[in-house]
């Protein structure tokens, strides 16, 4: 998600300005989960990777830009689509229990399952997928969908965010979820300068008190924002409230930053002692997976601390890592399973050399002593 939104120069500035306390790694590799997504055919690469519970012992994975085909068969045997899904039976990293899905055309060619279809959709719009959650009141899964548009069809870097929608998948639906609904939302900032642009949907926390906390990112500083709404009012945007630094405000424009230097995808999870852990990639794109600890879902949050230093960029100067987040649904007691994405600034050249590059990596963080 937004993986190409920064040129190499901005990545360098991000690395130089990152503010996490750089200490030794406090996480460990989760090798079995990383190996789960190392595949030769069918789905063999994607970023994004969010998880939502979808019934008893069933987890929905969903991804943004996805590679489909034969990873060893050359470019003619590969297709990129803008999003895809997978269903895992159970909570263990078993290849036999994980099935990937995407839509298909009349001749069987892979197609994107979630395509913008709302009233304000323009030709050429596509979705990258944000955070999501299962809403037991509505008996549906909700996924934030960023509506993107390339200003120049010949330039992959010319994309812009034109709006944020909600994808609604009723419980019991069968992938690739052709029966889903789409709802336009007012939850994106459409300013004229980079510091005025942003959106909600980077992360979601469903609290026991009935509120759904939705995190947003704004500006070049990657400022963290938060909104909340009760589960029964998710589709009524007049009921959404935005934290302004002192109270919950009706005006989204009054949203106050909780922190800066986070990533376009992240997670907020409760800790056993009543605090909350925010997991993100320092500065959006960097080798550092970081955390902040907060006293409530809206903060205040403590300083950024390093969880893990990714090594992929040391292997190749074109590789970069981004958008770390936790997956509590798949985490063992007393720990958090965390993913991060790996990509290349020279994507199509590098994917030919290393077809296993473009897939999530996983680490495991022990919660004791945080």
How does the language model describe each region?
Residues 14-15:
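Short, linear, compositionally biased motifs with a strong N-terminal bias
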Residues 24-44, 53-125, 134-193, 208-263, ...:
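Beta-rich carbohydrate-recognition and catalytic domains
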Residues 51, 132, 204, 266-268, ...:
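Hydrophobic core register within WD40 beta-propeller blades
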Residues 1-10:
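Bacterial N-terminal signal peptides that target proteins for export
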Residues 10-11, 21:
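Cleavable N-terminal signal peptides
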Residues 45-47, 127-129, 198-200, 262-264, ...:
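Beta-rich catalytic cores
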């Amino acid at each position: 998600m937004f993986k190409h939104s920064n040129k190499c120069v901005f990545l360098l500035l991000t690395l130089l300005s990152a503010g996490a306390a750089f200490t030794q790694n406090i996480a460990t590799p989760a090798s079995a989960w990383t190996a789960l997504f190392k595949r030769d055919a069918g789905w063999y690469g994607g970023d994004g990777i969010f998880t939502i519970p979808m019934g008893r012992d069933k987890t929905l994975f969903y991804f943004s830009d996805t590679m489909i085909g034969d990873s060893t068969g050359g470019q003619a045997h590969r297709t990129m689509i803008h999003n895809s899904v997978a269903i895992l039976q159970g909570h263990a990293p078993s290849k036999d229990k994980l099935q990937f899905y995407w839509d298909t055309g009349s001749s069987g060619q892979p197609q994107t399952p979630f395509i913008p279809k709302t009233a304000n959709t323009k030709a050429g719009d596509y979705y990258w997928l944000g955070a999501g959650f299962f809403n037991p009141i509505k008996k549906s899964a909700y996924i934030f969908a960023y509506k993107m548009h390339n200003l120049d069809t010949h330039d992959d870097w010319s994309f812009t965010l034109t709006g944020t929608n909600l994808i609604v998948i009723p419980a019991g639906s069968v992938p690739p979820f052709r029966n889903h609904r789409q709802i336009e939302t007012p939850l994106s900032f459409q300013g004229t300068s980079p510091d005025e642009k942003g959106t909600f949907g980077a992360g979601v926390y469903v609290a026991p008190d009935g509120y759904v906390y939705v995190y947003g990112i704004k500006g070049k500083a990657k400022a963290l924002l938060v909104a909340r709404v009760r589960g029964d009012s998710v589709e009524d945007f007049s009921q959404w409230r935005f934290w302004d630094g002192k109270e919950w405000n009706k005006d989204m424009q009054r949203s106050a930053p909780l922190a800066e230097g986070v990533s376009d995808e992240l997670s907020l999870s409760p800790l056993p002692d009543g605090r909350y852990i925010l997991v993100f990639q320092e500065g959006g794109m960097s080798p550092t997976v970081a955390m902040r600890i907060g006293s409530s879902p809206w903060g205040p949050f403590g300083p950024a601390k390093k969880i893990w230093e990714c090594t992929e960029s040391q292997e190749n100067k074109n590789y970069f890592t981004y958008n770390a987040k936790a997956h509590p649904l798949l985490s063992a007691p007393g720990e958090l399973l965390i993913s991060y994405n790996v990509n290349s600034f020279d994507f199509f050249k590098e994917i030919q050399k290393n077809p296993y590059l473009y897939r999530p990596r996983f680490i495991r963080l022990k919660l004791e002593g945080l």
